[in-house]
Amino acid sequence: MSLTDSELWDLAERMDIPLTFVGFKDELNNKKLKYNKSYIINMENEFDEDGQRNTGSHYTCFQVNKYPNGKKAGLYFDSFGMPPPQIVEDFVGEKLPYCEKDIQSLMNSACGWYCLAFLHFINVYPQRTKNLYWDTEAFLSLF
């Protein structure tokens, strides 16, 4: 069962995920990056070529952390193991590492659930290391 944007917001709040954005990828153009905040994006643009509003296709997510020592670490997560679209890298201002592991079947519509699980793991899970890359490896090892 797929999730709507409002359901993602609601669940993220209940899960204590520091979510700051849920929307179509082209809506990032009007935003400014916030460090240590989670972004869930729909891989379609808000409007199709005919000017009709899209209903959405597939959720992915990313986060860029800034640590007290000034070091930054970002990561893009797609449950299909695909790289980030150019619009995300332009928004972040640099090339983002991404998870290459495919954990979702093409016949499955649970991408929003996978995004929430990933973001909860890296932000809230009590046994996390608070190192974005190590925690991502630990999350992916569950699949």
What are these model-predicted stretches?
Residues 1-50, 91:
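Conserved active-site-adjacent core of cysteine acyl-enzyme catalytic domains
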Residues 1-21, 105-122, 133-139:
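Cysteine-nucleophile protease catalytic domains, especially the papain-like/related folds used
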Residues 34, 38, 75-76, 132:
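Intrinsically disordered, low-complexity N-terminal regions enriched in serine/proline/glycine
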Residues 40-124:
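Cysteine protease-like catalytic core of ubiquitin/ubiquitin-like
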Residues 126-129:
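Phosphate-handling active-site elements
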Residues 141-143:
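Short Fe-S-cluster ligation motifs
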